[in-house]
């Protein structure tokens, strides 16, 4: 929804910054929303078999066809600059929350924008990664919790995540089976391996059912 919505808003206002500003008014948002960059970038993936995919939308489709995992994600141009105010906001933050979201097409690309990962590492803020509840077909098939964190560390180095919040809630099996039929499964919480990545763990009941879907509890 978010990608389609912002494309429509940008088409309406002809300016991404203005579309974000107007969206804040529409949804009565508090605080400030900043796009990580104003430059036009392309999210690309290199698979373990050497295949290169130069389109965010095609990544899951090609992976499913080739049954090859992602080796790395990169953005072009690689030296794109952060939007005005982004690095300052990171420096001034009390807490930096990473995730939940699509690991390779959402979370990691934001960290690849020039200076962003470095600013997070240097920040004195509380840096926490919120674990995904389910794996994502075509991106994180069979990924455990530690493999999500390891992928981030391999792309931008250790230091952007200090803590990880993961779910300890019980999910009714019938809902899990619904996701299994679509190629998704619960993220295995291999907590001992997370500690090897140098990340402290925080247990919370994060999951709840909303309109038949497994979601993070906003409370």
Question: What residue spans do the PLM features occupy?
Answer:
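Conserved phosphate- and dinucleotide-binding cores of soluble alpha/beta proteins
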Residues: 67-70, 103, 107-160, 171, ...
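Glycine-rich phosphate/diphosphate-binding loops and the adjacent beta-loop-alpha structural elements
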Residues: 1-15, 101-105, 134-140, 171, ...
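P-loop/Walker A phosphate-binding loop and immediately adjacent motor/lid segment at beta-alpha junctions
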Residues: 56-58, 62-74, 110-134, 184-204
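Active-site gating loop/helix substructures
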Residues: 39-100
């Amino acid at each position: 929804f978010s990608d389609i919505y912002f494309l429509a808003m940008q088409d309406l206002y002809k300016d991404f910054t203005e579309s974000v500003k107007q969206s804040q008014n529409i949804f009565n948002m508090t605080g400030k929303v900043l796009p990580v960059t104003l430059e036009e970038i392309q999210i690309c993936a290199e698979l373990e078999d050497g295949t290169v995919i130069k389109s965010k939308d095609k990544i899951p489709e090609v992976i499913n066809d080739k049954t090859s995992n992602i080796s790395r994600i990169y953005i072009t141009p690689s030296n794109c600059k952060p939007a005005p105010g982004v690095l300052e906001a990171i420096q001034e933050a009390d807490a930096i929350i990473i995730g939940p979201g699509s690991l390779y097409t959402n979370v990691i690309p934001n960290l690849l924008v020039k200076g962003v990962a470095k600013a997070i590492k240097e920040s004195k803020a509380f840096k926490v990664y919120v674990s995904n509840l389910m794996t994502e077909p075509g991106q994180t098939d069979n990924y455990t919790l530690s493999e999500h964190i390891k992928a981030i560390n391999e792309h931008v180095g250790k230091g952007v995540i200090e803590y990880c919040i993961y779910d300890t809630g019980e999910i009714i099996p019938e809902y899990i089976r619904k996701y299994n039929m679509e190629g998704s499964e619960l993220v295995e919480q291999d907590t001992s391996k997370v500690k090897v990545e140098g990340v402290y763990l925080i247990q919370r009941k994060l999951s709840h059912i909303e309109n038949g879907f497994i979601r993070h509890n906003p409370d």
